[in-house]
Amino acid sequence: MQSRSTVIYIRFVLWFLLLWVLFEKSHTEEDIIITTKNGKVRGMHLPVLGGTVTAFLGIPYAQPPLGRLRFKKPQSLTKWPDIWNATKYANSCYQNTDQSFPGFLGSEMWNPNTDLSEDCLYLNVWIPTPKPKNATVMIWIYGGSFQTGTSSLHVYDGKFLARVERVIVVSMNYRVGALGFLALPGNPEAPGNVGLFDQQLALQWVQKNIAAFGGNPKSVTLFGESAGAASVSLHLLSPESHPLFTRAILQSGSSNAPWAVTSRYEARNRTLTLAKFIGCSRENDTEIIKCLRNKDPQEILRHEVFVVPYGTLLSVNFGPTVDGDFLTDMPDTLLQLGQFKKTQILVGVNKDEGTAFLVYGAPGFSKDNNSIITRKEFQEGLKIFFPGVSEFGKESILFHYMDWLDDQRAEKYREALDDVVGDYNIICPALEFTKKFSDMGNNAFFYYFEHRSSKLPWPEWMGVMHGYEIEFVFGLPLERRVNYTKAEEIFSRSIMKRWANFAKYGNPNGTQNNSTRWPVFKSNEQKYFTLNTESPKVNTKLRAQQCRFWTLFFPKVLEITGNIDEVEREWKAGFHRWNNYMMDWKNQFNDYTSKKESCAGL
């Protein structure tokens, strides 16, 4: 009797376990298979910090831009019949990779880590578990000077941000270099800015589909770094993008930076130059595009680096342009007119923005020594970063950036060139963008990132480099096996909290009052927030004197002295002619005097 009851009990337990397994399986399947407007996608569960995040990697959001679609705006997808397996990153878009320091982690970490292909328009989604309802969405746009980049880099992994802040993180690939930004403005076969239109189509995908993942399409924050931040600010300037997002975060980049946007004329000229180099010079634009579409992408990559004759270490060979569609005018003009999305922005820069560019060819600089440069090397560096600027213009930079009270320090020229490059290209444009935004009555918040990562592979003299706040924004120090310091883990958590607060509420302070308050940036006080492992501080007027030099004084110097070298050449030529006339007159006079004296003796 007892044995029979035991059998019944065992059967009951087995049935219960079977039902539980089936329930869990269906629950799990429900979590990792989601129906989008184009079809079903299967993701995967990732263990993260004692919990779980569901990741969907490599979801297509556009037709592959192959063949006749090369150089054209991205085309919407049709439906797929089966379940799309979104469990691994997709191809990276074609690009030239950084071969400057083979095997060196500091440069290799930014190179694409998946196969290169033109079939690259895919996006990734990370959602917290259990699946949320109406969660805030944060969309990441990578940088890389519009020439390189991919969403699959380890440093852009969205799982920690999704897990800790219970936000949905999205990132997308977009076309870069000539394949993304070659332009014959006005021609629909190659209108330019197709890399930006890729981003825009991904934003449309989020609006249509993110609710199925548990996201709120009315709470979407764009965030990006360097060219990614410039992209974010271009979406702020592009009316078609305005309904597709709510707020914006700009890390070390803005659309008014000198490298961010080229004129229609210059964009067209670069396309024609590439066509000439690659053997595609033709009588009309249609034939040029037809020829370029038949070229191997690797051949285009090889030649695109030669289209700027005076290339600097910050050259953007093919980037955004004024196409009359995505971008109707130069960013400075649109900012001046107040033609941008009225919303909240969070903007910031790193302490040593310039050093990352100096080691790629500035005279006397190297990652393998302290790069103590001379005055002559400083001046040669200015020639590289400011081609076409008159000698007087370059001397004005040297005069402004030299510390004349402490001009015996060995590091003075190295630090000065770091500041020149960082201020001109990153810091001052970002501050100017923020001022213009704030002046129109929008809430803006500005940060100054001061912490040098303990894991940074670059030498100590390079300081708090361009791009190295990203790992803290994405929570990489939370992964214990990587061996960041405890202070860095706490610091990273605080940054993720402030970024997520801003995304959720439009204010990095959120609803908490127990920490230092991050003030709103106003153009009269210009308060900004310092970010480091110590207690944050509120300071005012970051790089105010230097930025006045770049925004007010230097443009006047260029205007007055832009053709001074030509004037000098003309003056010298004129003086040489006059001198010849005078010498000829003197010779004639001497000859006359001599003859006169000869005649007097007769």
UniProtKB/Swiss-Prot annotation:
Substrate binds at residues 144-145. Residues 1-28 form the signal peptide. It catalyses: an acylcholine + H2O = a carboxylate + choline + H(+). It is an enzyme of class 3 (hydrolase). The active site is at residues 226, 353, 466. Keywords: Disulfide bond, Glycoprotein, Hydrolase, Phosphoprotein, Secreted, Serine esterase, Signal. One of its GO terms (biological process) is choline metabolic process. Esterase with broad substrate specificity. Contributes to the inactivation of the neurotransmitter acetylcholine. Can degrade neurotoxic organophosphate esters. The modification Phosphoserine is found at residue 226. Belongs to the type-B carboxylesterase/lipase family. Glycans are attached at residues 85, 134, 269, 284, 369, 483, 509, 513-514. Coiled coil: none annotated. It comes from Bos taurus. This is Cholinesterase. Homotetramer; disulfide-linked. Dimer of dimers. GO terms for cellular component: extracellular space; plasma membrane. CDD domains: Esterase_lipase. Pfam families: AChE_tetra (PF08674), COesterase (PF00135). Its main location: secreted. GO terms for molecular function: acetylcholinesterase activity; cholinesterase activity. Its EC number is 3.1.1.8. Present in most cells except erythrocytes.
